[in-house]
């Protein structure tokens, strides 16, 4: 199961996310057993839930990286310590960064809630 904590601040701006784990089960691969090796692990990209979550979170990370280049006030700490783990945390921002951070929160909330609604056994989303 993929576990994600999505955090916002008092101004309804994106604050952080932490994602860990891998989706598993028959629904996670669209009903197909896509096993790429004898260890029973799915092939990279063979799990629709992992792929969808990865695309959303990596897009968020790319957006933050791009925003940091455009804004001297926006600072983010991004970690990908091991396979199946990704986190991003805003460490500094200004009022000019708020619209982008509010949109990023909305983007992640809508996308991740849609995945969780369709695959509740594969994604555990906590929004705080």
Predicted segments with their positions:
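N-terminal intrinsically disordered, cationic/polar leader segments
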Residues: 1-48, 62-128
């Amino acid at each position: 199961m993929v576990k994600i904590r999505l955090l916002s601040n008092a101004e309804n701006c994106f604050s952080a996310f932490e994602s860990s784990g891998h989706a598993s089960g028959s629904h996670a691969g669209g009903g197909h057993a896509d096993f790429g090796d004898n260890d029973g692990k799915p092939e990279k990209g063979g799990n629709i839930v992992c792929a969808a979550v990865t695309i959303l979170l990596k897009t968020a990370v790319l957006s933050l990286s791009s925003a940091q280049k455009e804004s001297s006030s926006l600072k983010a700490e991004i970690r990908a310590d091991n396979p199946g783990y990704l986190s991003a945390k805003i460490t500094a921002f200004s009022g000019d960064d708020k619209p982008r951070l509010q949109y990023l929160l909305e983007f992640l909330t809508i996308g991740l809630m849609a995945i969780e609604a369709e695959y509740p056994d594969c994604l555990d989303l906590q929004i705080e």
